[in-house]
UniProtKB/Swiss-Prot annotation:
The keyword Cytoplasm applies. This is Translation initiation factor IF-1. It comes from Francisella tularensis subsp. tularensis (strain WY96-3418). Residues 1-72 form the S1-like domain. One of its GO terms (cellular component) is cytosol. One of the essential components for the initiation of protein synthesis. Stabilizes the binding of IF-2 and IF-3 on the 30S subunit to which N-formylmethionyl-tRNA(fMet) subsequently binds. Helps modulate mRNA selection, yielding the 30S pre-initiation complex (PIC). Upon addition of the 50S ribosomal subunit IF-1, IF-2 and IF-3 are released leaving the mature 70S translation initiation complex. HAMAP family: IF_1 (MF_00075). Component of the 30S ribosomal translation pre-initiation complex which assembles on the 30S ribosome in the order IF-2 and IF-3, IF-1 and N-formylmethionyl-tRNA(fMet); mRNA recruitment can occur at any time during PIC assembly.
Amino acid sequence: MAKEDCIEMEGVVLEVLPNTMFRVELENGRIVTAHISGKMRKNYIRILTGDKVVVEITPYDLTKGRIKFRSK
């Protein structure tokens, strides 16, 4: 799938799940399950509860996403 099709939204990490999965609450109040992108995994970027993140969501499944960036 092309990257232009993805929807980017900001959110806050609510819960850390096993296998580098996270429960994220988006700006609009929707809760999604997200995993870390490959570059973040490669560079050992840690994500904790309460971190602000940017999540990419596909229009096909609005309940799953990929964490693209962690704000400070």
